[in-house]
């Protein structure tokens, strides 16, 4: 039970966000020459798995995203594999420990070739997204195409998506692209916050 005491309320304040930023800086931010999943060449890179796979990073990221869940009154949270999976897993666990559980799903890039062959994973046999408000999340937003793919799949099965969120926004077009599809992007952190202090 002692571990539970360390989980702060959703409105955890600027201190936790500052701590999260430093974890991202230490574990996930890199300078170099990289080709991003969008095909764009960049001299900065965010590999968010090391942040999301360490306990404190996962907790703090989940708390920031859960603020957005409350703001937009989402009933479900989901995103595209692989980047969103650690995020939504942490959100499910932390929200339950706070007695404010949020249901989560993830969208496969390609349907499984066996079993249920579902594109959307996480729903029970009698559960669907028809008419449900879904917040789409991702670890990093660049062009916004990965987030948009998840949005399209959720909307295809009747989910309502008006908002998306990312842990780090590279500010390279995601906000504008999603706005064209009626979606507001909420960003926890921005790439400029890391470049300016390097």
From Swiss-Prot:
Keyword Transferase found: yes
Enzyme nomenclature, EC number: 2.4.2.10
Pfam families: Pribosyltran (PF00156)
Catalytic activity: orotidine 5'-phosphate + diphosphate = orotate + 5-phospho-alpha-D-ribose 1-diphosphate
UniProt xrefs under CDD domains: PRTases_typeI
Gene3D superfamilies tied to this protein: 3.40.50.2020
Binding-site residues for orotate, renumbered to this chain: 142, 170
Keyword field: Glycosyltransferase, Magnesium, Pyrimidine biosynthesis, Transferase
Glycosyltransferase listed as a keyword: yes
The protein's role, per its UniProt record: Catalyzes the transfer of a ribosyl phosphate group from 5-phosphoribose 1-diphosphate to orotate, leading to the formation of orotidine monophosphate (OMP).
Quaternary context: Homodimer.
The protein's name: Orotate phosphoribosyltransferase 1
Organism per entry: Mesorhizobium japonicum (strain LMG 29417 / CECT 9101 / MAFF 303099) (Mesorhizobium loti (strain MAFF 303099))
Gene that specifies this protein: pyrE1
């Amino acid at each position: 039970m002692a571990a539970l005491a360390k989980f702060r309320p959703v409105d955890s304040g600027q201190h936790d966000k500052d701590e999260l930023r430093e974890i991202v800086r230490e574990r996930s931010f890199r300078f170099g020459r990289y080709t991003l999943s969008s095909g764009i060449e960049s001299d900065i890179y965010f590999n968010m798995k090391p942040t999301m796979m360490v306990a404190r990073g996962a907790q703090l990221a989940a708390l920031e995203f859960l603020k957005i869940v409350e703001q937009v009154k989402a009933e479900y949270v989901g995103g595209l594999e692989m980047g969103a999976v650690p995020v939504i897993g942490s959100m499910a666990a932390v929200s339950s420990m706070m007695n404010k559980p949020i249901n989560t799903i993830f969208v496969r890039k390609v349907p499984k070739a066996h079993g249920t062959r579902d594109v959307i994973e996480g729903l029970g046999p009698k559960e669907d997204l028809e008419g449900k408000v879904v917040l789409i999340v991702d670890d990093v937003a660049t062009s916004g195409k990965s987030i948009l793919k998840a949005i399209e799949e959720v909307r295809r099965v009747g989910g309502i998506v008006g908002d998306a969120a990312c842990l780090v926004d590279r500010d390279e077009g995601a906000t504008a692209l999603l706005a064209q599809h009626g979606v507001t992007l909420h960003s926890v952190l921005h790439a400029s916050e890391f470049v300016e202090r390097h």
